[in-house]
Amino acid sequence: MASAMESDSGGGSGGADAQPPLAEVDGGLARVTRQLLLSGDDPAARLRALMPLELGIFGLGDLAQPVLVRDFLNTLTLMSGHAYPAAVLRHHAYYLLRAASFSRRSFGLGHLEAALDVLASSLPPTTASPATDDPLDGSRLIAETRALAATYRRIIEEGSGEVLAVSGPTATFAFVEELVADTYLARWDAFPREGLSFYAFNAAKTTLGRWLVTVYAETNRYPWAAAGQGQPTAADIKAMAVELVEHSGGGAGGGEGEESGGGGLFHRPESLSSVVASLPLARRRAVEILGVYAEASGGQTPPVAAVPVLAFDAARLRLLEPSGALFYDYVYEALLWDQTYGVPDSVIEAFLAGMAAEMEALAARVQEAAGSRASFSPAAIEQVATVLLSAGLNETVAGDYAMMLASVPRVSRSRWRWLEATAALLESLSGFALHFFRLLPTASPTSRFARVARAAYLRAEAEAVDRRARRTSGPSTPAAAPAATAVGVGAAADPWDAVTPLRIFIVPPPAAEYEQVAGDLSSELLRSLLWVRYSRLWQAPAPAPALPCKPPLLPGEQGRRQWTAAVAAAPRTDVEAYCRSLRAGQTARADPAYVRSPFFPAAFIEFQIWPALRRVLSNELPKTRSLAALRWLVSFGSDLALPSPELTRARRPLELIYATVWEIYDGAPPMPGESPQAVGLRPLNLEGEGKAGDAGAEGAEDEEGGGPWGLSSHDAVLRIMDAVREVSGIISETISASERAAEAPPLAWPTSLFSLLFTLRYSTTAESLGLATRRFLVSGETLSEDISRLTGAAWRLCSRPLLYDAETGRVQIPLATEEEEEAVVAVKEKSVSSSPRHYSTDLQTLKSVVEGIQDVCRDAAARWALATADTATLRRRLLVPALRESRGIADHPLWAHTSEPLRPDLEELNERVEHALELGYSLTGALRRSVAYRFRDYTFARLFQPPAIDAERAEAIVRRDARPPPVFTPAPRRLPQGGADTPPPLSMDDILYLGKSICKALVDVLDHHPAAPETTPIKTYTPAMDLNPEQITVTPRSPSVLAAFARTARVQTHHLVPALTDDSPSPVGQTPPPFRILPAKKLAAILLGNGRNASKRRASRDLSPPPHGRWRAVLDSSPFSFSSSDFSDQDEGEGGEADLRGVPGGGGEGAYEEDRERPSDIDTAARAQKVETSCPRRRSPRTTPSPSRRASGGGGPDRGEAEAHTYPPYLSAAAAASRVRPRTRRGATRRPPRPTAEDE
């Protein structure tokens, strides 16, 4: 039987920040019993033994074993002379049922029935028969639990969408939460039960509009509303595909701005070498259409790499209805990548205006469906989901839009009016939909989902603030500056509040149920631990503790002796001397003569709680002694002391501090609904080496459950600070009321423990992001170096007129003279060209070279854009929520009472990552602006156009001996203007490079050395008809992408904060390095080396790097400490090769050692092989590639395999006919087999 707990293990993306700490303690109830027997009369040891049941869960199967339950109850009976064990024994049925869980094992309803039978047999006969008013009565709880199990069984069998509603003390049971979550999972699994009204389908004016809606609905298996136009059949789907291919593929005819001969739905692939390089969303749309058409016509589906992209023209763009705004992803993708297919700007802006208005209306409908609800509402969740799904927005579509927007530089949004507003609305809607649909499958009023939903809400809030800050501040790079002045309407402010509607997922804590339970507990310690459990499960503050109405009375002779001792209470001076003599964590037994004194609470707070807590916060004690001291402060004298509001208020936050520090060091017991498999490793470790728990693994006690587990929540440090602040107020009140108030030192807390806990919390995140940023920048440098030679050659190729001989079909490419290139004179003499200044090749080879240059450039631009998007996603997922907590820590009121403030360095890390992303976007923009990016489509478009005149008309003109008609008037030569921007002609090295990397046929003539053909004119014509060789002229563009990358980096240096440069000033007269991304001292703080290698007993207060250590060699050789000669100050027009001086990887003495980490798919194979053989050792201590490294190609799977997963399978006609859809809704595969009545 599968457990109900496993059904709640999904949790969406927000679960990483809300995950409870660790796996279940091995041994369960048997281990607790064993530790309880070993505790003896030590109250702190008893507390330690029962802590797994107080804060965690154990397997429900343990309760089904009578021997385990009997041994546990007998052990409690031996300790019933103490108030805490006596209170547990009195309500043992509630105590055990509260922590019981379906757990990781195969426990089902049969085990639950057996457990209830065992507990029923353990109840005393006096309480088993009559009904009592006690809400924690065992027989009452067992009866209510049986009724809940029967209701759950009926709900699951009927499958009507009903959910389990629970109230009273049973709502605090772990397994009841799991049953409730399972009924909600069944409800969301069957959603939507009613048909969806796809209004875009009914409003569509074209076959393409109806096709897009049909593919979306059928692929995701969404039901159609009966009131609509009707669900298309398999024959309808085939007919739509045939019509789109046969009747629309060749052009719409008469479209405004339509290119001659190219106005159809499908355009040629813009890159034949990689499907990633050419508009993936548009290509996927084309694959869907052509795949169904191939099956309908009995043909074969073409290869993905040969499929054209789905395009548009002016006529079709006008016919796209705004109601289907979210179905036109291929249009937005093309516009953001500057692909207009000849459509006029006026048509594009009118289209964008309609789409922006429709998206604003959709956002308003979402807001209306969510309403003003501020807490969990299943009805509102269903309404919002219906609105989003009907409009065409689900989790998959939202993810596609998020990736598309993240991979495109923000400057690309400023070309047309309304494009910025449309992109901003798409960003807000897709971000909201991602959070919404990730929370939907596991939404339930349980503590597990409450933690997930709270983490997701806080993350969405932090992302919205970050997005608003980036939008209002504007880009700081010069290349992106125009975006701030050409923004469309509605882009200045946040277009829509995408955070508030998520409140419908926020689950309010069941405070009333816990109040009812707490009011019936007789032990103050048991009551306090109940509220600690409440705070930990629901991440909500507990109410102020109430004063117990009567002191705890203990049975037997011991109770009489304690009461007699209380009568003869010691005076104040003796009590204070007694409290001074106590040793925290070591004195086991309390003396009733002093503990029951009315002076004991104030003396214990002043002489024990204050100094002991100072020692714990100063990190002077080892982990084990710190936990023991906190346990002792909580439990010492708790069974004997008189009721005291001061001591009760002081011990409650101490219990919370103990539980939180425990889970940070070693991991506390698991919480209800948590999958143990999901918490075995730290969720923030991107490198796969979980060493963050080393601080707690050394010398960990077996009974503490030591192990390398992660944290329970994202605000653990803040919870400790809140608790310390609460204790501070109590200590201040106590000291101010004493006679020594004037002599008491000021209340100040050390910060070493906070520094250590913060280091443990974020060391993995900081180190992973630091390494990812380094690799990202190294990949950018490598890409700039490799692609700059290609863009430089393309620039030089189109900077001079190319001479074409129509009779021989040869093209003469100008080469540099001896004065321009003295180093290649010997190579020139080997050329077979008729002129030493030209290189001869045929026209088809030139076309292949032109196409290859554009393909390689676009492939590099697309891959780098994806790598930049992955880095931006990594920052948004890990760093943005961490920044929110770090800022909360820095602004916490507790720092007003500390010896020195804590300065988290996540702000500096954020600045580094932001600057790296800005440089990444600038590189993407430089690639898009290079001449090679549009080499075929614009620069050499004339080569690929149909001939302007056919042979018959040419012969007629020749026979008539007439001058050419106006159509033959040669176009004016667009030669480059003179000056610094005029590049040198193409060199022979460029020819060899293009022949080796782009088209081998270009240099085949050098190997064969054929003789130049001798041609004799057959006829001669009059001067009026003799035409000079056609000159193919182009407009020059910038050659060097590396120059743009370097110039951006150099200019960016003026905007960097001082934290990004060396702390020491430059010598007088010496120019500081222009670009310094990761200096040694600052990088040391980011890597948090002191958190990794320093003593586990003391954390550094200033987080400064150690003078010596394993990172020193890495820091000293950091590839980002560039010298002033790394980037040339020459202008871009002086040539691309000049900008390559000092670039890493050159193979000389100045080559950077970090070249070993370059991704293999960006560099050449020879370079990769050379690096692999010459650099057997790596400086990086980690060998597993980070996500950003894999995204850029390094260390990932084969390129073909990676690209194969880029596009989902198309919708086949057979699948549509049989209703077997290839894509499954999120959440359907997460459903485990539900618990049944069978007992394994």
UniProtKB/Swiss-Prot annotation:
Acidic residues: bias regions: 1128-1137
Biased composition regions of type Basic residues, renumbered to the chain: 1220-1233
Interaction with large tegument protein as annotated region, ranges: 619-1240
Extent of Low complexity compositional bias: 1116-1127, 1182-1191
InterPro entries assigned to the protein according to its UniProt record, in alphabetical order: Herpes_U30, HSV_ITP
Keyword set, alphabetical order: Host cytoplasm, Host Golgi apparatus, Host nucleus, Virion, Virion tegument
UniProt superkingdom: Viruses
GO cellular component: host cell Golgi apparatus; host cell nucleus; viral tegument
GO BP: any one term: virion assembly
Disulphide-bridged cysteine pairs: none
Self-association and partners: Interacts (via C-terminus) with the large tegument protein/LTP (via N-terminus).
Family of the protein in this entry: Belongs to the herpesviridae inner tegument protein family.
Function according to Swiss-Prot or TrEMBL: Plays an essential role in cytoplasmic secondary envelopment during viral egress. Interacts with the capsid via the large tegument protein/LTP and participates in its transport to the host trans-Golgi network (TGN) where secondary envelopment occurs. Modulates tegumentation and capsid accumulation at the viral assembly complex.
Protein name: Inner tegument protein
UniProt organism field: Epstein-Barr virus (strain AG876)
